[in-house]
Amino acid sequence: RIFQICELSRVLKENGLGGFHGVSLEEWLCVIFHESGYDSQALNYYNGSSSHGLFQINQPYWCDDXDSESTEPSVNACQIPCSKLLDDDILDDIECAKKIVKEPKGITAWEAWQPFCNSDLDQWKC
């Protein structure tokens, strides 16, 4: 499912992501746009790992992909199958993103943040 920006903004806000760990809704909307194009089914492969869903949450560290050919054991820090990050229910994705942003790298764990989302965020307001 591809979300519309203001619909996604409302869902993120209702589930406590706006301002969570100092990250604004606009920053999240910008990051999610650049990571997945607001597509809850986005799946990308890079360097032997895979990234899943709206937030492009990475396997093997954050989720477990039982079908993966990765030789690295899964840490599964979010305690979730990667397939659950590819459905239209994004509440589990949001909870995992909260765990990620609380890590030392914070929002910079998402590579899109630095080049695209750390300055003028007016276009991401709803």
From Swiss-Prot:
The keyword Disulfide bond applies. It is found in: Secreted. GO terms for molecular function: lysozyme activity; metal ion binding. InterPro entries: Glyco_hydro_22, Glyco_hydro_22_CS, Glyco_hydro_22_lys, Lysozyme-like_dom_sf. The keyword Glycoprotein applies. It comes from the Eukaryota. Keywords: Calcium, Disulfide bond, Glycoprotein, Lactose biosynthesis, Metal-binding, Milk protein, Secreted. Mammary gland specific. Secreted in milk. One of its GO terms (cellular component) is extracellular region. Glycans are attached at N47. Disulfide bonds join C6-C126, C30-C117, C63-C82, C78-C96. Ca(2+) binds at K84, D87, D89, D92, D93. Pfam families: Lys. Residues 1-126 form the C-type lysozyme domain. Transmembrane segments: none annotated. Lactose synthase (LS) is a heterodimer of a catalytic component, beta1,4-galactosyltransferase (beta4Gal-T1) and a regulatory component, alpha-lactalbumin (LA). Belongs to the glycosyl hydrolase 22 family. Regulatory subunit of lactose synthase, changes the substrate specificity of galactosyltransferase in the mammary gland making glucose a good acceptor substrate for this enzyme. This enables LS to synthesize lactose, the major carbohydrate component of milk. In other tissues, galactosyltransferase transfers galactose onto the N-acetylglucosamine of the oligosaccharide chains in glycoproteins. This is Alpha-lactalbumin. The gene is LALBA.
